[in-house]
Amino acid sequence: MDQAIATDPEARAFAEDGAILLRGAFADWVEPLRAGIETLMAHPGPYERSYTPKDGSARFFQDLCNWQRIPEFRAFVEQGPGAAIARRLMGSQGARFFHDHVLVKEPGTSLVTPWHQDSPYYCVEAEQSVSFWIPLDPVGRDVTLECVAGSHLWTKALKPKRFDGTDLYEGDDREDMPDIEAERDKHRILGWEMQPGDAVAFHYRTMHGAPANTSPQRRRRVFSARWVGDDAVFRDRGGRGSPPM
């Protein structure tokens, strides 16, 4: 299955760019994941982190680490092709599931997901890592996830921030994140029009962000699933771990 879904050229592109598109990789899981998200939104977990814009537009729902209590999410993790694809892309002998993350931008929300890397937020250190960003609704190029090609190879440690722009860790003296939006012409920015069941696979260090959902009618439901490989170790970053450890 991993040979058929993640080819050698895709694995090489993942290593070089830190982000690739996998067409139809999770098409069989669209309906189960949609059902799981409806259950989750009706009964959020303890790690829900939703945002409501100050301008009164629709909310941006987020929730993490629910795969052990939402049956459809557990089935995806244990029976789906994610682990096999992750092993292939990471070049790892094994693949350990790290966590799930649901992101729902309701129609008309003005909230933008700012440019960031995931690695500074996680209680893990891993060169072998991959996130799958799986839309459950059609996603136009204007509202899709965007990734800075090759940014997973940047050597500088960058300062993580909350979505409101404040520092995540007090007294953090690392370099600020570059203003990708202001210098888009200096980077090769990857982004794709996507269908339900497609996926963007990206490295934890890949710089990424996403626009507001400007559609007045269409939701943008996304299920993200994250794996780590053989070299992953626990890293206490001084904050609340995700997943809790």
Regions found by a protein language model. Give the residues of each.
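Short, conserved beta-strand element in jelly-roll/cupin
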Residues: 123-140, 193, 226-229
